[in-house]
Amino acid sequence: MQLWHVGRVSHEMVQPDGQQPVAPSALKGEGAQCFVEFEDGTAGQHPTSTPRALETDEIPGIVEDYRQAAERAKRAGFDMVEVHAANAYLLNQFLATGTNKRTDQYGGSLENRARFPLEVVDAVIDVYGADRVGIRMTPFIELFGLTDDEPEAMAFYMAEQLSKRGLAYLHLNEPNWAGGDITFPDGFREQMRERFSGSLIYCGNYDAERAEARIGENTTDAVAFGRPYIANPDLPERFRVNAPLTEPNHETFYGGDEKGYTDYPFMDNGYDRIQ
């Protein structure tokens, strides 16, 4: 179960009582859209609203929201949870210098910008225990206007802090997952391995061959797949027998119904397996 808060990547139409979305600072995301339901009953993507900055005394309440979400997940039977601190959503917005312009204890230095995300992690650990909690991060990502002046330093700091807490895993998204030329700096993966004692997972634009190579480098323990898994419900088996993959239909992403999510076919039972 993944726990997340989108922060400024939202709109007043989907907020309680039509309130503004919240963020570390009142900066609107660039080119950001969210899925909303319109007055005529239809639904679709819509540009996000300008957020308001969270008051300092509101932040503990959001930490408590995460704690309660973890408690509900546990009662529902989920074995573990992943804290989503990636993809330009709320926790990522606090970590990055371009979206966090605060002057209180939640802004400025590395330690201050990481304070809220780590408070969330601690709250979730209180519910599940550290060995049942992971976190997803996207250092170096540039999305919806989110930028960071010191992404490597923040990634290293977070890795060290999470390692001290005994977190089960750290899940890192490749910065070029949506295209582009941004990559991790030389030596970054090795440094993350040194700083984090739990399992490391990478994801984003991988295929089977590239995933095997990455694991062989000993810089990661696993590679995760998202979009290929949506379009290929039997993805591990396709990898095992070297079968062709179905390409996902991007037009159905965030569509709000089953089309493009649960209607992709499994392999033909007669597929000639390649050993």
Task: Please name every model-derived segment.
Residues 2-275:
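Flavin-dependent oxidoreductase catalytic cores
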